């Protein structure tokens, strides 16, 4: 079982530093988590609250009739972009769980329509917020407009307004797909700056939808910086900043409201006797931070969120260990930032996301690429679900908590061990719907070869 590190202060001892530098799977537990979250959380010089999450959800609802008309795949849901909650008892062993340690579920964002990943949440929300703002400015909508009025934003007059503007983003893949597809569908000129580790099929999918793809030889951080700089020169360009955007973060947070209803519909309680553990793959941190913020706001002390990262790209763990006032890169730790989990190949975390998570996050853990491929196959064989390697990252989480001495010690210290049999473990799968069959076949072949 992977070794576990639990630093108790900002000054890290030699053991976790050595484990990170050796790219060994490890667990970090957050000593600054507050059981009761503040109603208003500080982030990036501002404050956000549950009201902001509800406003993001309301924006999705206002746009649902328009989205239903623009995207055929949303006709069955009335324009709602959501994913199912799936029982996964057949994956207990793969997740490191034994009898009496709780029930395993999957939040299947790998099935999300339009973008095929978790990025459909934040990315599409920011595009919709921009479209709404421009529509109000140009008289296409009024503050009194209802959801049916939003259908008019697909008309030629609205598209002519949107066509004057460029929506740009820097991405390793999935956020680019989300932003590019949504912006292009509404009539914006969409530009996606993609890092060297972005998959070719994702570039092709964007180009097929009329999105301009700018390829960069460097990593995610370089692609974002290039996109940000280019957009800054054009007053009609809106840059979706994955490292800094609150609109993205709040779009992700809206998932918590729907998940709360799904849990209730499934008869799953979340309280002191029925804790909820959520395991979220993490790249720069905006998506899992947004979801964690929303979950902590709606479910309080009894939800414990953990971020999963590749051993060569643990940017969020590195940032949380360093604390505020520092902004380390994985390169500073002698790591390569090279991983087949392209959506998680990020060298430096989002500072706003890290600031927001300091009192909310329970911990982070890292996984090897080989583990991702093995678990991708285990998910396929047990459930029939097809996910990307990065989407498998959360499946290692339960084993870190229940299968290691430090994990069990933490569960005891938090008063969670006596209630473990009634716990729910929720693995958030983040992408996979649009992976081409030939690419998935290579994933599966590698996973089966590993045994």
UniProtKB/Swiss-Prot annotation:
One of its GO terms (molecular function) is pyridoxal phosphate binding. SUPFAM superfamilies: Tryptophan synthase beta subunit-like PLP-dependent enzymes (SSF53686). It is an enzyme of class 4 (lyase). The modification N6-(pyridoxal phosphate)lysine is found at residue 119. InterPro entries: D_Ser_am_lyase, Ser/Thr_Dehydratase, TrpB-like_PALP, TrpB-like_PALP_sf. Its cofactor is pyridoxal 5'-phosphate. Pfam families: PALP. Its EC number is 4.3.1.18. One of its GO terms (biological process) is isoleucine biosynthetic process. Transmembrane segments: none annotated. It catalyses: D-serine = pyruvate + NH4(+). Keywords: Lyase, Pyridoxal phosphate. The keyword Lyase applies. NCBIfam families: D_Ser_am_lyase, PRK02991.1. Belongs to the serine/threonine dehydratase family. DsdA subfamily. This is Probable D-serine dehydratase. The gene is dsdA.
